[in-house]
Amino acid sequence: LEKTPRYPFVCIYGIGNALLIKNLAKHYKHLFVFESEIELFILALSTIDLSEELCSGKIYLVDIEEERVDIQLLILFDMKDMFEYLSLYEMFVNNVYYKKFYEDIWHKADELCEKNIKVVIRNLNSSLCIGFECYSHLLQNIPSMLESIPFQRILSQRKNKFENAIVVSAGPSLTKQLPLLKAYQDKAVIFCADGALSMLEKEGIVPDYVTNLDFTDLAMKFFQNKENKTSLNVLSCATHLSLVHFLDNKSVVLRDDPLYQRFNLNDFGYIDTGTHVSHFSYTLALALGFKNIIMIGQDLAFDEEGNSHSKGFSYGEQFNGEKTVPTLKAQAYAGKGEVLTHITWNDYRIKLEYLFACNEQKAKFYNATEGGARINFTEELSFKECCEKLLTKEKPQFELPKSLTKNRSDKLLVKFKEKIQKDQDNAKRFLDDALALKQILENILSKDFILPLEFLEKVYQNIENFNHSLD
């Protein structure tokens, strides 16, 4: 308590007799208690009633030996009231007994938390440049989005119409799967990450959906074949403007995020695009109700020759952009030794495992990559076995859904502009209020005499009101 005044959460190794835990819970919003032996949780709970604290989310009990502990920690640390304070993280130990006899284990718990905190915050750009750029793209893409195919029309016409999907990524293992993919392309709906598109086209394979979320224009190189008139290009609202303008047969989709939902453009949302394009493909397949999702080319690792991508990748099999990222070892597909990956791919893998674990009641995920890193919460099965087992029926053929009428899209654009104008007015008001408070605080600090308590209380209340209005 002395070290953590006003901390919103605390992590403690060891439940002990639970009396200390119950008393500490009164002082924190969340208390995370770690143990390596679930029997100790059971014993403690049999002596002290923590039911109220557990039900309210005051106390979380974490078994560090549980198979899904990484997923649990990612969910917990990604909560809004946790994420903002992760820099305060520290693992405390319940008592001297735990420190003396469980030293290795509580260090393991500490490392587990540190690892998952890094995954949660890794994509946060401290300068916010990426966030601002993506938001800028959103604002500029809105007119094109309103003229594109509404995402909700795609769902209403195609959801739950077929069970089998193949998600194609551009990893080194893809090349060996292409002949079989071509043979079975009429018996599975194909979701293709943009980087794999040219490789499929060279083999005469036409994907049903092509996904993209690049905020840079590097992906322009993937879409050079303008003869493809049947694939539906599903783009994130933050996709680079050049690509949005370049592509036909497109649906520009809003992310499943309050920032985007507040515009009330519900016909064009909402989906979890994730932070890499294959994640987008999986969430799109889930949104469309597919029950069996087969993945190929999802290596998330270098192959034995050091290749980062499949043969025929537009930027080369050994893409230079992958060589500057710090590397590490990961368990290989089917548990056959280890493979070399890097921290970005490893983060992607963990986030995919999170996605698959959260959706295992909705779909079965088959990893038919036959290479690369092992991905938990998937069934590893050869691509040939997947095809023979699941792909027995012809997939349905669909016409491309229609866009909104020009009259309706124009009306939505007018409403959107009105909303943005209100946002600008509010932003100016917040800025003016912030500058006024800053001036007052600077004046207070510059005084060499004690100011009246009533005045200071009023300033404090103004700061509290300002913070509340930001929430």
Set out the residue ranges of the language-model regions.
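Short acidic, glycine/serine/threonine-rich loops at helix termini
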Residues: L45-S46, L178-P179, K202-I205, N212, ...
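Glycine-rich phosphate/pyrophosphate-binding loops
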Residues: E35, A196-L197, G204-D214, A285-H309
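Short, acidic/turn-prone active-site loops that include or flank metal/cofactor-
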Residues: E35-L40, D194-L197, N212-A219, S236-H240, ...
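Phosphate-binding loop/pocket of nucleotide- and phosphate-handling active sites
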Residues: N307-L355
